[in-house]
Structure formats: structure tokens, C-alpha cells
UniProtKB/Swiss-Prot annotation:
GO MF term list: lysozyme activity
Record has Repeat as a keyword: yes
GO biological process: carbohydrate catabolic process; cell wall macromolecule catabolic process; defense response to bacterium; killing of cells of another organism; peptidoglycan catabolic process
Taxonomic lineage from the root: Bacteria, Bacillati, Bacillota, Clostridia, Eubacteriales
Organism: Clostridium perfringens (strain 13 / Type A)
Protein name: Probable autolytic lysozyme
Record's keyword terms, sorted: Antimicrobial, Bacteriolytic enzyme, Glycosidase, Hydrolase, Repeat
Gene giving rise to this polypeptide: lyc
């Protein structure tokens, strides 16, 4: 794997173990990113998380949160516990990807633990519409996780080296914890030291999976107050723009009730092309989205069982596969055997 680089963001991660922290001094040390422990399992809330968040933000530091995973507890319940606590302490304006800290098995096999991690990560994404990162250490990745987790970015821990060793799950990292014995002004005792790439930063995923676009128009499609040709125009959709059909109103045959940029109204069905939406079929946990339409192609995303996605086209190069868009805006190919059109 690649090593440390002076162009990377400098960071620390902290918890209640560090007590009260002077984040002004931390910033003056050149630290740019602070990851804060929020929760553990479904039973522990870090009592310093709120003050750490508010004080770090007040100094203009980039803030992220992590959850320490307990494999003997329900994964989805842990995800909800994590996000509920962030909401409880008012931590809604964080800057970095939400982190899953996995470093204990509690008797779980690599397959079982990886499945639980995926359940946690996808539940966090579902609740927050924000992106995630996996924190672990090199030997743990090699011995206790499998390559299904490789679709998520990595924050790797390995001490006393300039570059982390290769592992069987990931080929690159966006975070590297290189020491647990850092000495930073403003922090009592030792703290973990990290370098982060820009990819650790996250913005709200505002992608919306639309189910329709315009057709047979060259300029604008009028949005009307009611499904009548002489009804008041309340908005316009530029040709080629996507929007959401909400439903067909039995009071206005030949019209769709739609939503476009916070405008809800009616458009004539003559000028609407509906996309083919779909969901999973005969899938127990999740459906792999692959880079190409082959079973040995790289997995680039996953779709939870029952999740809705859009079929973009059938690619003649990959018979038996659909090119799709997930609800998070990820593109790739899924096997047609596991797809139900809706």
C-alpha cells in the first residue's frame, strides 16, 4: 500500500480517555481532522462526544465520528444507536465519513463478521444518506474479514511503519493511523495519530433516484396546478431533466402528479418517458453491483434486499446483465436473474 505523504490531512482520533481537550492548541499543532468516539455496541455513549464535537467545530477543525463495533450485538440496532446518539448531541454538521471501528470478532467467522459489518454500514447510509469508512488494522483485515468489505473505503491502523502492509481486502486507504503514542498540545497523554486523504471528507449525498424524464419537447415541460390544459402553470421542467412521478391521479386521466425541485404539480403524460425501476429478486441479504457484467468483475456497490434501483439499459456486451443506478447514484451491472422489474 502507499505510504504517508506530506500533502495528506493531519488528524487525531479521541475519546473519553483523553478527557478535556484544548482544540485551539490542537489546531495550532497543525491538526486538521478530528475523529471522535460516539458509541460502542448498543450500550455505551461517550460522555465527551458532545463537548469534543462543539469545541472542535468552533476551532474550524474537520470532524468525524466513529462507532466501536461489538459482534455479539445486532448490527442494525448498533447503527441506529450510533446515529440516534449523534442526533441526541446535536452532531449533524460533521465533515467526515462516518466510521465503523471493527477490531474484535467475539467468536464470529470472517464471513459472519463481514456480513454484520455490511449490515451496519448500509443501515448507517440508509438512515443518514451519508457515506461511510471502515477502520481496522492490517492483521485483523487479513485474518477476520473478507473481500466483500472492499467496496467501502478503508482507514487502516498499523504502527511503526511508513506504509501499511498489503491486506487481502483492500488495495488502498483514505486514512492511515500510524501511531497510538502521539503527543499533541492540548491533549492529555498519548493519542492516535493519522493521515487522511481528501476522500475522508464527506458531503451530504443529495442524489435522488428519479423515475422519469421529458420526451417530445425541445424547450420546457409545463408543470400545472391541476391536471388540466388551462390550469395555472406553477413551474417548468427543461427538456431532458429528470423528475419523480408520485402517482397517477384518477381525477386527471392522462396526467401525472410529479415532483421537480420542490415543486409538486401535474404534467401531461404525452411528454413523459418513464424509466424502468426494479428491485431485488430471490436475494437473501444484498445484491452485488459489479464494474462489468461478469461474475468475476470487481464489486463497486451493493443493493440491500428490497431496495429500489433503476435499470438504465441492457448492454449487448453483457447478456443476462442490466446496467443500473442505485439510490445513492452508483452505477454498475447486476445479474438479471436477481432483478424484478416494477
Amino acid at each position: 500500500m502507499e505510504g504517508r505523504n506530506s500533502n495528506n490531512l493531519k488528524g487525531i482520533d479521541v475519546s473519553n480517555w483523553q478527557g478535556n481537550i484544548n482544540f485551539k492548541s490542537v489546531k495550532n499543532e497543525g491538526i486538521e481532522v478530528v475523529y471522535i468516539k460516539a458509541t460502542e455496541g448498543d450500550y455505551f455513549k461517550d460522555s465527551y462526544a458532545k463537548q469534543n464535537y462543539k469545541r472542535a467545530k468552533a476551532e474550524g477543525l474537520k470532524v468525524g465520528f466513529y462507532h466501536f463495533f461489538k459482534p455479539n450485538k445486532n448490527a442494525k440496532r448498533q447503527a441506529k444507536y450510533f446515529i440516534d446518539y449523534l442526533n441526541e448531541i446535536g452532531a449533524t454538521d460533521y465533515d467526515c465519513k462516518l466510521a465503523l471501528d471493527v477490531e474484535t470478532t467475539e467468536g464470529r467467522s470472517a464471513y459472519e463478521l463481514t456480513t454484520m459489518c455490511i449490515e451496519f454500514l448500509e443501515e448507517v447510509r440508509k438512515i443518514t444518506n451519508r457515506e461511510v469508512v471502515v477502520y481496522t488494522y492490517t492483521s485483523f483485515a487479513n485474518n477476520n474479514l473478507d473481500n466483500r468489505l472492499g467496496v467501502y473505503p478503508l482507514w487502516i491502523a498499523e504502527y511503526g511503519v511508513k506504509a501499511p502492509k498489503d491486506n487481502r481486502v483492500w488495495s488502498s486507504w483514505i486514512g492511515f493511523q500510524y501511531s497510538d503514542k502521539g503527543n499533541v498540545a492540548g491533549v492529555s497523554g498519548n493519542c492516535d495519530m493519522n493521515e487522511f486523504k481528501e476522500e475522508i471528507l464527506d458531503v451530504k449525498n443529495n442524489f435522488k433516484l428519479y423515475n422519469a424524464t421529458t420526451k417530445n419537447i425541445s424547450t420546457y415541460l409545463n408543470i400545472r396546478e391541476k391536471g388540466e390544459i388551462d390550469s395555472k402553470i406553477i413551474g417548468k421542467i427543461p427538456a431532458g431533466e429528470e423528475f419523480m412521478i408520485k402517482w397517477v391521479d384518477s381525477n386527471y386521466l392522462g396526467w401525472y402528479l410529479i415532483e421537480y425541485k420542490n415543486i409538486t404539480g401535474y404534467v401531461s403524460s404525452k411528454y413523459v418517458e418513464k424509466f424502468q425501476m426494479a428491485t431485488t429478486y430471490n436475494v437473501s441479504d444484498f445484491l452485488n453491483v459489479r464494474e462489468r457484467g461478469t461474475t468475476d468483475s470487481k464489486v463497486v456497490a451493493i443493493i440491500d434486499d428490497g431496495e429500489i434501483f433503476r435499470i438504465d439499459w441492457v448492454d449487448s456486451d453483457y447478456i443476462g446483465w442490466y446496467r443500473i443506478t442505485t439510490k445513492y447514484g452508483k452505477n454498475g451491472f447486476v445479474k438479471a436473474d436477481f432483478v424484478k422489474k416494477i
